[in-house]
Curated annotation (Swiss-Prot):
It is found in: Membrane. This is Probable metalloreductase AIM14. One of its GO terms (biological process) is reductive iron assimilation. GO terms for molecular function: ferric-chelate reductase activity. It is an enzyme of class 1 (oxidoreductase). Keywords: Electron transport, FAD, Flavoprotein, Ion transport, Membrane, NADP, Oxidoreductase, Transmembrane, Transmembrane helix, Transport. It comes from Kluyveromyces lactis (strain ATCC 8585 / CBS 2359 / DSM 70799 / NBRC 1267 / NRRL Y-1140 / WM37) (Yeast). SUPFAM superfamilies: Ferredoxin reductase-like, C-terminal NADP-linked domain. Residues 97-214 form the Ferric oxidoreductase domain. The chain crosses the membrane at residues 18-38, 70-90, 100-120, 137-157, 168-188, 198-218, 222-242, 347-367.
Length: 508
């Protein structure tokens, strides 16, 4: 009687996880609609409500993991333990973790569609932080699923762990488990910075193994509808990798023994793009398997679509990625809100180092619109980096450069908005030329900035004193590109002054 009872219990729970899988799929549908609606309803700039409400609203609108990951965890785990005892039915809940991990891959792939996300209406880079945290969560619960069964089989004297793990369907699960387990360590920030290429390859192999092997491993099957949804998303991604890609020639590369490199690409092969757009370059042809396996390199286009060339301004490692030759442009995508380009009236652009590539094309486009206020500030380490301006076709009247040599290592560090005291100057020796009353170098060269500040940090309140007008906040934009410290200062300034804010992270 006990044996028949056990058989009955086992058979009755075989399909017990199917409703939960459908529930998680419903959560994904609801969450997708939530993302779209919140992006449309919540204004992009801080408004004059309480600071915590502003912070909450922007966290929702920008898909910040700080808000969205707890929301997702709450939605998927509230009904996780239901009807069956956790202790008595541990196998059921381990299987449920595996099913949860697989179904959430649908959302994770959805977040990474590019060049622009056609479903959610976000820019590709907007969703990268959420994608990273969701990937970690999916990986961890997938690993818990695998390790949980290994421990269970090891502790059960009635079964052999080896024989269980080497059964066909279970062994396929083990194969899918291995790259996920390695990925958990390879995704650590230290390793990613040390060898992003190896991390990316492991990431690709891990996701392919999970998407295509788990449908064979899982019982009951996850083929319908989950695998077919993922297959459709992968086909969409594959088509975009082919349709949007094109071959391009790098025709010129100028280094000039400085930290910044100017690269010129042939214009004819690239479709039109918006100012501030990025492109991703691959060394491989589309027919080469490495095209699909190896990471691409993102660069920002510093020129406008109506120019005869494509300009890139990059900071390279010892081994340059881009040399004169042939490359594949995987896609071209924009992260700039259209309202900045078409509706703005007052714009301040603050960039550091190679971040000039992001700000430059926006600046050149806005120069054609006759705005009420336009200022472009570029923070660099060395005066010699200004050689880049000789290759860029634009009016430098509204450009100011801050040469920060002999200041702290972060070449784009700015003066805190809460700090008191005078700006710091170093002992840079330079030829005495015409200077304004603050000590800034005045130039008349059409290829030189209107003002060059030596050894001085940017003081947001002083140097942007004419930027903010209370009656024009809706159409006022602060654009920042550079390292985290610059973006943090810029975002703080935008919050305090209730203007629109666009940021782009460059680890320069």
């Amino acid at each position: 009687m006990d044996a028949s009872s056990l058989v009955k219990r086992g058979s009755s729970t075989h399909y017990a996880n199917l409703p939960y899988g459908y529930y998680v799929l419903g959560v994904i549908v609801f969450y997708t609609i939530f993302l779209i609606v919140m992006r449309w309803l919540i204004p992009s700039r801080y408004t004059k409500v309480s600071p915590w409400k502003n912070k909450l609203l922007q966290s929702i609108r920008t898909a910040s993991p700080c808000f969205h990951m707890p929301l997702l965890l709450l939605l998927v785990f509230v009904p996780f333990i239901h009807k069956y005892s956790l202790v008595a039915y541990i196998s059921l809940y381990l299987k449920r973790l595996g099913r949860l991990s697989y179904v959430l891959v649908i959302l994770n792939v959805l977040l990474t569609l590019r060049p622009a996300n056609p479903i959610l209406g976000y820019h590709y880079l907007d969703l990268i932080p959420l994608h990273k945290w969701l990937s970690r969560f999916v990986t961890v619960i997938g690993i818990i699923h695998g390790i949980g069964f290994i421990v269970k089989w090891s502790l059960d004297p009635k079964v052999s762990m080896i024989s269980k793990a080497t059964k066909l369907f279970n062994f396929i699960g083990v194969i899918a488990f291995v790259p996920l387990f390695i990925l958990m360590f390879a995704s650590v920030r230290i390793w990613r910075r040390y060898s992003y290429r190896s991390f990316y390859v492991i990431h690709q192999l891990g996701q392919w193994a999970m998407v295509f092997l788990v449908p064979i491993h899982a019982r009951p099957r996850v083929t319908v509808p989950y695998f077919f949804i993922l297959l459709a998303l992968y086909i969409w991604r594959g088509i975009s990798y082919i349709y949007y890609s094109t071959t391009v020639n790098v025709t010129q590369r100028v280094k000039d023994d400085t930290s910044l490199t100017y690269v010129k690409l042939d214009r004819s092969a690239i479709r039109d793009w918006l100012p501030g757009s990025h492109l991703r370059l691959s060394k491989y042809k589309k027919k080469n398997p490495l095209y699909w396996l190896m990471p691409t390199q993102p660069y920002t286009i510093a020129s406008l679509p109506d120019e005869s060339q494509i300009d890139l301004i990059i900071r390279e490692n010892l081994t340059p990625y881009v040399v004169v030759g042939e490359y594949t442009v995987v896609d071209v995508y924009s992260t700039v809100p259209p309202s900045l380009l078409y509706d703005s009236q007052r714009v301040a652009i603050v960039v550091g180092g190679s971040g000039i590539s992001f700000g430059l094309s926006i600046f050149k486009y806005l120069q054609t619109r006759n705005l009420d206020y336009l200022k472009f500030i570029w923070l660099i380490r060395e005066r010699e980096d200004m050689h880049i301006l000789n290759h860029c076709n634009f009016e430098t009247n509204d450009l100011e450069v801050y040469v920060t040599r002999s200041l702290p290592p972060d070449d784009t560090q700015t003066k805190s908005m809460n700090a008191n005291g005078s700006s710091e100057f170093d002992d840079i020796d330079f030829e005495l030329e015409t200077m304004d009353e603050s000590g800034a170098l005045l130039t008349n060269d059409s290829k030189s900035p209107s003002l060059v500040h030596f050894g001085r940090r940017l003081d947001w309140q002083v140097d942007l004193a004419q930027f903010i007008e209370s009656h024009a906040l809706q159409n006022s934009w602060l654009v920042c590109c550079g390292p985290e410290s610059l973006l943090t200062d810029g975002e703080r300034y935008a919050k305090q002054n209730y203007c629109n804010f666009v940021k782009e992270f460059y680890d320069i």
